[in-house]
Amino acid sequence: MKNLEQTWRSILDEFHQQANLREGHIVVIGCSTSEVAGRRIGTSGSEQIAEAVYKGLEELRDRTGIALAFQCCEHLNRALVVEEETAKAYRLPVVFAIPVPKAGGSMASYAYKHMKAPVLVEQIEADAGIDIGDTFIGMHLKPVAVPVRVSQKQLGEAHVTLARTRPKLIGGVRAVYEAE
């Protein structure tokens, strides 16, 4: 578990540097703890792995002021666990269910139990995202998503994909995108 935690912190450090995360940004996290453990998604959830992932994200949140949004599994329509203050600040309509490992997933369930005032929302437009185990978080990212490449491409046995977003470039041939 120690190696997993070190790898995770390394991934988060590189992600933070490249994605330019700061206060006011929302980061969506999709995590299959089963995939991290080398099993098929949705079959072998692990609270121990969820705890390690959550703690690393808490540290990142405390350092940067970002808001975290944990994606539930398909059984809860990929709803997101966020702090109530995040839902209010971003005017996100709250829905209700209590994520549990078999309906929501171990990661979302762990987050729900350990956040100060957790609520569920159906949609979000996050500024950045972390997908551990191919959970498909793209539906919750703002357009335009830009891949973030880090040196570690796996957490345990799970494939890790990271993204940041940028504003759409508008205009035509006369548009200017860089300040002189």
UniProtKB/Swiss-Prot annotation:
Alphabetized InterPro entries for the sequence: Antibiotic_NAT-like, DUF436
Gene3D superfamilies linked to this entry: Hypothetical protein TT1679
Pfam families: DUF436
Family listed: Belongs to the UPF0340 family.
NCBIfam families, per the entry: TIGR01440 family protein
Name of this chain's protein: UPF0340 protein BLi03936/BL03990
